[in-house]
Amino acid sequence: MNLELLESFGQNYPEEADGTLDCISMALTCTFNRWGTLLAVGCNDGRIVIWDFLTRGIAKIISAHIHPVCSLCWSRDGHKLVSASTDNIVSQWDVLSGDCDQRFRFPSPILKVQYHPRDQNKVLVCPMKSAPVMLTLSDSKHVVLPVDDDSDLNVVASFDRRGEYIYTGNAKGKILVLKTDSQDLVASFRVTTGTSNTTAIKSIEFARKGSCFLINTADRIIRVYDGREILTCGRDGEPEPMQKLQDLVNRTPWKKCCFSGDGEYIVAGSARQHALYIWEKSIGNLVKILHGTRGELLLDVAWHPVRPIIASISSGVVSIWAQNQVENWSAFAPDFKELDENVEYEERESEFDIEDEDKSEPEQTGADAAEDEEVDVTSVDPIAAFCSSDEELEDSKALLYLPIAPEVEDPEENPYGPPPDAVPSSLMDEGASSEKKRQSSADGSQPPKKKPKTTNIELQGVPNDEVHPLLGVKGDGKSKKKQAGRPKGSKGKEKDSPFKPKLYKGDRGLPLEGSTKGKVQAELSQSLAAGGAISELL
């Protein structure tokens, strides 16, 4: 697909719903890879579903966690995926094989995970009621980032666009800018409302292009800043936001905010309903409101990196928002000018003459001179939309798509070989011996997959009884986690996992698992003893 031909001449934001993506289980979070070709969706049963966004089909399913997936992030080259679940586990996955490379166990719930934009060996983790932690995957070490006050409980953090700095924000409205390599403080400022009142920082998001970033605060205002101005002001600066975005009518609180792929628009999802508000960053005016199904709550929003497409999650389903495709059946003249009606073409006297005797010899300029130039059809130029401003070439090892092979139930070993009768007896004996060797090797236990290394991360002064916000309030933590985890069969009220073998009783379709299994077996034995007839047993 040629992205240059997709350049829209009008508005560059979605206008209407363009279908849904059903992940079978309930979706909680989603994120695009760097090129927008793959969409990773974290589900309620711990699985990660990777969608091929061009075909809108499932390319891979990774059984990642036991508990719900709460945060996802792609590596820069697209080969790795880091995930966090509500049981305080952070894992790194190989996208092609689906294997887990590393696993980290934290003492408190994880609110966000993020790869370093340029170094996929570093991962930023935001634990609940703790300072942010930067993991180094190669040696499994971690560094706790400094905070403004030791009593800071809820601290959010994010890498800037190139990963040179880490921006952190606390519940008192204080923003710290730390150097990524040394964790030194280079700038700081406080977000205030009006005079001196402070407001809590809920999230920090950076644009893919440019130096702008936005801050979502508890006072229901989205503030847009220029990162260069923040660094210029230094410590305890007082920078003014470029824009302040809010819903003045309904005073809507914002669940998730992000920039468009080109950084010219900002989308914010309402925390009250399934509604997306889109603003133009340069002017600050509201250009579009996208309304989903009434009564649904929004969970996550992601904007496509290079196209005007938005993916939002509500009620466990991924909704896609795109532009309205208008078909054009107009007629075009040979010079590609659009015609409103059929026009009879009047040719010039000498237009189709091979040689014009009366024409003088002009100098070749413009299009005539370009006809004599050689056209390079072998070299491939990098696509500007996929390259950063400080890069010249694309990543040749990037993972854009997942290969899919057809599943054959009974493959023939040699469909194009000679028939069995034509094989000599000596070759048949050798084949039989090799077949025995193959069977013996198959009967033996296959080498198990390498178990991922699990590292326990110890954080000082962090309570161990915290419950993730996705699971509800603190208290009955066990029951909450059990309900939110991978579904288990219980009297047919909950869905069964499609990857679990099932045994059904008669036409009622009750899965024989756990305590229900014993109950159904007791009923069966009683009915057999009483001489009852069973119509069907699967």
UniProtKB/Swiss-Prot annotation:
GO terms for biological process: DNA damage response; response to estrogen; transcription initiation-coupled chromatin remodeling. It is found in: Nucleus. GO terms for cellular component: histone methyltransferase complex; MLL1 complex; MLL3/4 complex; nucleolus; nucleoplasm; nucleus; Set1C/COMPASS complex. The keyword NAD does not apply. Residues 344-360 have a biased composition (Acidic residues). It comes from the Eukaryota. The modification Phosphoserine is found at S350, S388, S389, S497, S525. The modification Phosphothreonine is found at T252. Residues 344-377, 408-519 are annotated as: Disordered. Residues 330-366 are annotated as: Interaction with ASH2L. Residues 371-380 are annotated as: Interaction with WDR5. Residues 479-490 have a biased composition (Basic residues). Its main location: nucleus. One of its GO terms (molecular function) is histone binding. WD repeats lie at residues 22-63, 64-103, 148-188, 196-235, 249-291, 293-331. Pfam families: WD40. The keyword Manganese does not apply. InterPro entries: RBBP5/Swd1 (IPR037850), WD40/YVTN_repeat-like_dom_sf (IPR015943), WD40_rpt (IPR001680). Residues 491-510 have a biased composition (Basic and acidic residues). In embryonic stem (ES) cells, plays a crucial role in the differentiation potential, particularly along the neural lineage, regulating gene induction and H3 'Lys-4' methylation at key developmental loci, including that mediated by retinoic acid. Does not affect ES cell self-renewal. Component or associated component of some histone methyltransferase complexes which regulates transcription through recruitment of those complexes to gene promoters. As part of the MLL1/MLL complex, involved in mono-, di- and trimethylation at 'Lys-4' of histone H3. Component of the SET1 complex, at least composed of the catalytic subunit (SETD1A or SETD1B), WDR5, WDR82, RBBP5, ASH2L/ASH2, CXXC1/CFP1, HCFC1 and DPY30. Core component of several methyltransferase-containing complexes including MLL1/MLL, MLL2/3 (also named ASCOM complex) and MLL4/WBP7. This is Retinoblastoma-binding protein 5.
